[in-house]
Amino acid sequence: MSTLDDIFGSSPPPTTHHAHPNPPTTTEPSDLPSLRRQHVTAGYRDGISASKTSHVQAGFDAGFPIGAQLGMRAGTILGILEGVLRGYDESQKAVVKKLPAGRKGATSTNGTATPTSTMTDEERQAKRAEILALYQQAVKELDVRKVFEGISEKEISGGEKAEVRLGRQGEGAIGKWEEKVRVPRWEENMDALEMKDTVTAEGTGVEVEES
């Protein structure tokens, strides 16, 4: 035994077997799962955002013309009923101004008695109440949720385009009220009045130029 062996100790005897290397670890760094979740979430949101943008625009392009047309027709129906109500209110004000207070009746030029103002007022009020009830019913039934209620997702996803199915549903609701209010007749009267106003305005303009 040498002096160095006395100081540092003897070396261990050589071994005949080979040491096996440690198996590779599969443990991820602690921040990788968090980063993966963040990237997945960000990608999911970006995908939804891009999909919504394209589908919403496509749905708007397909559905807006139909909805706008139905909305204008519903507005025409409600506008007619509102105009009739205002007409009854204005006629009532005119009657009150023309007839003195407390006067129950009047005599026409041919000597026959005309209906009393009280009876005329009662009839007018009854008719106005009838039209008001019709208007309130129209407001309720022409609400967009009421017009399109009853359509299930199964019906829409059955192969037919959603805007076609919704348009047919809206056509039924709007068409019923157009027939009830007689919209075509009102439109004809409005066209005649507008034409009359145009002719009157043109005639007035000619007279002004000649004078």
Curated annotation (Swiss-Prot):
Q: Where is the composition biased (Low complexity)?
A: 105-119
What sections of the sequence does the record tag as coiled-coil? none
Which cellular component, as a GO term, is one annotated location? cytoplasm
> Where does the record say this protein resides?
Cytoplasm; Nucleus
In residue numbers, the region (deca-GX3 motif) covers: 43-83
Query: Could you tell me where the Pro residues compositional bias lies?
Result: 11-26
> What's the domain of life for this entry?
Eukaryota
Sorted alphabetically, the Gene Ontology BP terms of this entry are:
protein maturation
Task: Report residue spans for region: Disordered.
Answer: 1-35, 100-121
**What is the stated purpose of this protein?**
The complex LTO1:YAE1 may function as a target specific adapter that probably recruits apo-RPLI1 to the cytosolic iron-sulfur protein assembly (CIA) complex machinery. May be required for biogenesis of the large ribosomal subunit and initiation of translation.
| Family from the record | Belongs to the YAE1 family.
User: Subunit structure, briefly?
Assistant: May form a complex with LTO1.
- Name of this protein: Protein yae1
